[in-house]
């Protein structure tokens, strides 16, 4: 039986420097929480970005037996969610609109989200304790609030593989605990 998820011989050079050198590992069953540990600058973020297709690399990544490199970006987005340390969102939009971005793979370009999608987005914001900020401009939120909104977006994406890059780095102690608990429940 094939592994649920496997990384085989991932190698990557950036700026002439070898960042990843034949990295391999596998996860046999879904629902597992796996951590990548290593020093600052050790390539953890680079590996996550390579796995989700953001960085070109040598080697192979498989999810449920399908090689991710062969998938179109929309199909890849249906299967894999990457949650970076910083969201990269730099345009003014409400917190609920950020969460609604999680439905992108299921929406046609420029289509309006349905009432059901809006309700699901609001439930996700409620789940992470941010429902009261649904209409606030995302750019005005604190770093921790932004991370919780991004977690809410991840909840509506409903993908098979979630890749978190330091998801609790901007959170206070209480929200760190809540974030870890929510990740374990996904």
What do these predicted regions represent?
Residues 5-7, 20-22:
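Conserved structural motif at the start of ABC-family nucleotide-binding domains
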Residues 100, 115-133, 158:
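Conserved ABC ATPase "signature" region
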Residues 52:
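Helix-to-loop junction immediately C-terminal to a conserved catalytic motif
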Residues 28, 59-67, 76, 173:
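Conserved ABC transporter NBD signature motif
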Residues 137-141, 145:
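Conserved ABC ATPase signature
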Residues 36-39:
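The feature captures the beta-strand-to-loop junction immediately N-terminal to the Walker
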């Amino acid at each position: 039986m094939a592994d649920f998820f496997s990384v085989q011989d991932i190698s990557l050079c950036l700026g002439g420097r070898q960042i990843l050198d034949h990295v391999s590992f596998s996860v046999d069953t879904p629902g597992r929480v796996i951590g990548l540990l290593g020093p600052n600058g050790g390539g953890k973020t680079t590996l996550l970005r390579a796995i989700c297709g953001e960085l070109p690399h040598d080697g192979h990544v498989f999810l449920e037996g399908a090689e991710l490199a062969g998938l179109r970006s929309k199909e890849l987005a249906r299967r894999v969610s990457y949650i970076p340390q910083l969201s990269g969102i730099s345009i003014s939009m409400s917190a609920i609109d950020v969460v609604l971005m999680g439905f992108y793979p299921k929406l046609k370009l420029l289509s309006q989200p349905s009432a059901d999608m809006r309700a699901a987005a609001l439930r996700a914001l409620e789940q992470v304790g941010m429902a009261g900020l649904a209409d606030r401009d995302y750019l005005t939120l604190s770093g921790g609030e932004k991370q919780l909104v991004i977690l809410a977006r991840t909840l509506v994406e409903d993908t098979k593989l979630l890749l978190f890059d330091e998801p609790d780095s901007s959170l206070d102690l209480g929200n760190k605990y809540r974030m870890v608990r929510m990740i374990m429940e996904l």
